[in-house]
Amino acid sequence: MIGPMSEESSTRVPVTYEHCAHIEGPFYHGTKSTIEVGAEVVPGYGSNFQAGRVSNNIYFTALVDTAAWGAELATALAGNGARGRIYVVEPLGPFEDDPNVTNKRFPGNVTQSYRTRHPLRVVGEVDGWEGHDPDVVKGMLDSLALLREQGLDVIED
């Protein structure tokens, strides 16, 4: 079986630390940071999405588009005007569905987003990835700002 759906039953198989081997890459990590191929991305650094918060997990995805959101939002929230980076990564330990997006607006994990408390090894970089329209990114940033104002910008970490 490849991917988060079981071919026999068409029901989603949740991805947990104990049950993640059925998910195959490639995997991507979108970020504002410049990282060398061969380096390991580890948890324990500041969150890109909440100032002053240390992230206990590293987040990654099986979709370039989802990684693009990570890269674009991280750079926009940093306010540095730079273009984000998308890296091809391999998890060095077990991982699980990202509970911040799984079964939220849509059933399942449509963004194919995962998180781990273990390192991710950078094995390459995605060059020439297509970003989202600036107005769409602004809309997402405005939505995040509204959630923050309402105290609803909760990150399950």
Predicted regions and their residues:
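Short polar catalytic/cofactor-binding loops
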Residues: 30-37
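Short, polar loop/linker segments at the starts of domains and inter-domain junctions
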Residues: 37-49
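Conserved NAD+-utilizing ADP-ribose enzyme module
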Residues: 2-25, 32, 48-58, 64-157
